[in-house]
């Protein structure tokens, strides 16, 4: 079991499965998290900016997760801008209310992954559909 920043205990791949379900079948009234772009291909050393837009004000209750192939999701950023322990300082989160960004200042080969935002402001907690980052 893994503890997320939103206080939910989940099996390793449950977070991604729930993200997909909420994205596809979100109930009326749920906060929708929309990520863009859906995918991008960058060269090592380039600056990357991922965006996440909430359908209503979530203050700064947004987290960012990284999921590498065949691995469980890892928390990168919580509270919109707080870097989780051990996360390299090239990862920076910003934003408030409805508009949020995750920036990778100098992308590295090991950053190949899917990146998801999630909101913990209003139950049920919801997640974006993700951005797939590929390295050229």
UniProtKB/Swiss-Prot annotation:
Matches recorded under Pfam families: V-set (PF07686)
Stretches the record annotates as Framework-3: 86-117
Region annotation Framework-1: where it falls in the sequence: 30-52
GO biological process: adaptive immune response; immune response
Annotated region described as Complementarity-determining-2, given as residue ranges: 79-85
Entry superkingdom: Eukaryota
Region (Complementarity-determining-1): 53-63
Keyword Signal included in the entry's annotation: yes
Span list, region Complementarity-determining-3: 118-126
A GO cellular component annotation in the UniProt record: immunoglobulin complex
Keywords: Adaptive immunity, Immunity, Immunoglobulin, Signal
Region Framework-4, annotated ranges: 127-136
Cleaved signal peptide residues: 1-29
Region spans: Framework-2: 64-78
Protein name in the entry: Ig kappa chain V-V region MOPC 21
Organism: Mus musculus
